[in-house]
Amino acid sequence: MKAIVFAYHDIGCVGLNALAEAGYDIQAVFTHTDNPGENRFFSSVARVAADLALPVFAPEDVNHPLWVERIRELQPDIIFSFYYRNMLSDEILSLAPQGGFNLHGSLLPQYRGRAPINWVLVNGETETGVTLHQMVKKADAGPIAGQYKVAISDVDTALTLHAKMRDAAQELLRNLLPRMKEGPLPLTPQKEADASYFGRRTAADGEIHWQKSAFTINNLVRAVTEPYPGAFSYLGQRKLTIWRSRPLDLVHNKLPGTVLSTAPLTVACGEGALEIITGKGEAGLYVQGDRLAQEMGIVTDVRLGNKPSNTLKRRTRVLILGVNGFIGNHLTERLLQDDRYEVYGLDIGSDAISRFLGNPAFHFVEGDISIHSEWIEYHIKKCDVILPLVAIATPIEYTRNPLRVFELDFEENLKIVRDCVKYNKRIVFPSTSEVYGMCDDKEFDEDTSRLIVGPINKQRWIYSVSKQLLDRVIWAYGVKEGLKFTLFRPFNWMGPRLDNLDAARIGSSRAITQLILNLVEGSPIKLVDGGAQKRCFTDIHDGIEALFRIIENRDGCCDGQIINIGNPTNEASIRELAEMLLTSFENHELRDHFPPFAGFKDIESSAYYGKGYQDVEYRTPSIKNARRILHWQPEIAMQQTVTETLDFFLRAAVIEKTAAPKDELNA
């Protein structure tokens, strides 16, 4: 059987040797050149390939059409990936009739993503393993050919566990590869509900937070000890690295980070204490804990912790245009919870952000972006991060007021983009899931999916193309003039304060608010085209946490990125959303304040939205970028979001009803 191999690291060497032992006809080996900045403790795939007299390549982009064509010419029957660090394109995977298989260092679907060996230790797991699975478009998500379990001991480090995983990979491949030569193996689909994802780790992730338990900190130490950069803390400005430690079940009344003793060197944690067995100080020598204390002048009752800043760092100034809107007010709440941020906001109303008006870190001006251009330009110049959240984003307006949509969503926002270029300010721009249009991919990918819209006479696409054109303009400014930007694409965020019932009364609201209005007023719930359209609903708190991490932008990780923010597991049709709402409504404690349910009513989209409307059957995000870049995973189930959103609007409706007679008397 002819095979193409993509491999790196020790596991890559194991995989290559296992294929050779099993008698595979290896046509070519693709690997990576060594990174001089990486502590390379593992064997070389290139050397193993050379010893086996195999052709070996290390292209910068193996998915380039030239390399795809060269692989096509080799006519592989099967493709293997063993710790190769780049995703292989669908085009490459389609070249092998038997498909492509990847060896992953965990028991999938748990610990998808990067650095699974380090992560299982950080999280204190007692078992892991290796998985051979078929490669699909979504990373680490394909059906499983086989697994081999590995026990994790209390004293395992990343290096010792790596050795166990290497042996496990060898055993798994010795079992599976000969059978795969005889014919396709039965594959077991992964359970998405059990999946977890962990992103890339950096040296900075080794910083110790002493308020955590001694057990948790010790897990970090063994996860990142040699050959990795190590867990570290600071004594004033001086850094110390911990190579080996031991958690102690010790009761104390000291603040976390306080040195309890120097021989042995023991530090108070949020729960228990940590004995530092070996480490290094600024001299760089590997020494015992008590010697480390002597070298660094550590004494009892001194505190270890974060490196103090030499200068008083001012707060990051965030300008939010449309601060009173759904995303704007929730984002403001999250930013003001962190004393690193100061928020400047503009909007035509203030009902949703009135709760922040007394906060000294919040500055608000009531105004219209089309009128207050001088105020906006001044504050773009003054602030650090700019979020232009002002837009018409309700579907009925796309056909009812297409020119107004274009003028506000494109023309006014283009001015803001150009001011960001002019003053060299970072822009975090709200793109939209609408830009994907009628994309035919199973999951909409920021980097590869086609953006497909309808004909010109379908005016509903004016919002989509206005946003898409701004995305392209921002990208071009980034490439040509160095604009710092991040584009984020929300997928059906919902929660309290999404639109309001007055907007729903004139049809200018999102789906859930419109459905709630029907329940509140006792009118039939109108299901456009039967409500068969599916969407992935995302809780506002999940969405805001991702957006907060984009604004935070650790190590510039979000610069020049496009990031979908959605929850693929919360997919439901509009009819299913309506039924879920109805169930929660009937069980709500305020149910008696509202009329009887008037039933469902199917209605054609043209009758509801008018001529020029065209709908999309489904809209499912790929969130690999959010997981990889932000280390973010949506957590809140749709039922919880629906319940909280309904509760917010029902309580608001009751207050509105009880206030009405007073208003009439005052009149």
From Swiss-Prot:
Q: Describe the subunit structure.
A: Homohexamer, formed by a dimer of trimers.
Binding, UDP-alpha-D-glucuronate: 393, 398, 432-433, 460, 492, 526-535, 613
Catalyzed reactions per annotation? UDP-alpha-D-glucuronate + NAD(+) = UDP-beta-L-threo-pentopyranos-4-ulose + CO2 + NADH; UDP-4-amino-4-deoxy-beta-L-arabinose + (6R)-10-formyltetrahydrofolate = UDP-4-deoxy-4-formamido-beta-L-arabinose + (6S)-5,6,7,8-tetrahydrofolate + H(+)
Formyltransferase ArnAFT: where is this region?
1-304
PANTHER family in the record, alphabetically?
A: BIFUNCTIONAL POLYMYXIN RESISTANCE PROTEIN ARNA, UDP-D-APIOSE_UDP-D-XYLOSE SYNTHASE 2
> Which pathway or pathways does this protein act in?
Nucleotide-sugar biosynthesis; UDP-4-deoxy-4-formamido-beta-L-arabinose biosynthesis; UDP-4-deoxy-4-formamido-beta-L-arabinose from UDP-alpha-D-glucuronate: step 1/3; Nucleotide-sugar biosynthesis; UDP-4-deoxy-4-formamido-beta-L-arabinose biosynthesis; UDP-4-deoxy-4-formamido-beta-L-arabinose from UDP-alpha-D-glucuronate: step 3/3; Bacterial outer membrane biogenesis; lipopolysaccharide biosynthesis
Query: What job does this protein perform?
Result: Bifunctional enzyme that catalyzes the oxidative decarboxylation of UDP-glucuronic acid (UDP-GlcUA) to UDP-4-keto-arabinose (UDP-Ara4O) and the addition of a formyl group to UDP-4-amino-4-deoxy-L-arabinose (UDP-L-Ara4N) to form UDP-L-4-formamido-arabinose (UDP-L-Ara4FN). The modified arabinose is attached to lipid A and is required for resistance to polymyxin and cationic antimicrobial peptides.
Q: Which cysteines are cross-linked by disulfides? A: none
What is the species listed in this Swiss-Prot or TrEMBL entry?
Yersinia pseudotuberculosis serotype O:3 (strain YPIII)
What family name appears in the similarity comment?
A: In the N-terminal section; belongs to the Fmt family. UDP-L-Ara4N formyltransferase subfamily.
> What domain of life does the native source organism fall in?
Bacteria
Put simply, this protein is called Bifunctional polymyxin resistance protein ArnA
**Per its record, what are the GO molecular function terms?**
carboxy-lyase activity; UDP-4-amino-4-deoxy-L-arabinose formyltransferase activity; UDP-glucuronate dehydrogenase activity
Gene3D superfamilies cross-referenced by the UniProt entry: 3.40.50.12230, NAD(P)-binding Rossmann-like Domain
Marked site: Raises pKa of active site His: 140
Where do the segments described as Dehydrogenase ArnADH lie? 314-667
Q: According to its record, what are the GO cellular component terms? A: membrane
Q: Which GO terms describe its biological process?
A: lipid A biosynthetic process; lipopolysaccharide biosynthetic process; response to antibiotic
Swiss-Prot/TrEMBL site (Transition state stabilizer) positions: 102
Positions binding (6R)-10-formyltetrahydrofolate in this chain are 114, 136-140
Does the UniProt entry include the keyword Lyase?
no
Query: Which InterPro entries does its entry note?
Result: Arna-like_SDR_e, Bifun_polymyxin_resist_ArnA, Epimerase_deHydtase, Formyl_trans_C, Formyl_transf_N, Formyl_transf_N_sf, Formyl_transferase-like_C_sf, Lipid_A_modif_metabolic_enz
NCBIfam families in the record: PRK06988.1, PRK08125.1, PRK11908.1
